[in-house]
A protein has these predicted regions:
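Glycine/proline-rich, positively charged
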Residues: 66-121
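N-terminal binding-site loop/beta-alpha segment at the start of enzyme catalytic domains
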Residues: 1-55, 121
Length: 121
């Protein structure tokens, strides 16, 4: 499901869809910071208000967010910033599964994995 300008543009309807899914027993929600430039995460966060503990919440980072070349990739700096931004948009203090949307050819995999390990701490 996509929410925001890339998908369902009706925010209230998007929240109803998520609520119906949760009521039907779905307990895994996956989104990404790049989906609708963060709007999908914001809508998911609103929908999960009061129900966060009932859901395994996943999101992703890597893809460009805007034209700034520093707002993308697998560098430690970007991963930490992207995680903080996702937490804020999702209105939560933890993400159950934080995923790399795709590997970065510009960043050593050890840097990416090190940043992800530090986020767990």
């Amino acid at each position: 499901m996509m929410f925001g300008p890339w998908g369902n543009k009706d925010e209230a309807d998007s929240i109803r869809v998520i609520h119906r899914a949760l009521d039907a027993g779905i307990n895994f929600v996956d989104t990404a910071d790049v989906y609708s430039a963060g709007e999908s995460e914001r809508i998911v966060g609103q929908a999960l208000a009061g129900r966060r503990d009932d859901v395994v919440l996943a999101t992703k980072f890597f893809m460009p967010l805007g034209t700034d070349p520093n707002n993308r990739g697998g560098s430690r700096r970007w991963i930490i910033r992207a995680a903080e931004n996702s937490l804020r948009r999702l209105d939560t203090d933890y993400i159950d599964l934080y995923q790399v949307h795709r590997p970065s050819q510009d960043t050593d995999v050890e840097e990416t994995l090190g940043a992800l390990t530090d986020l767990v701490r």
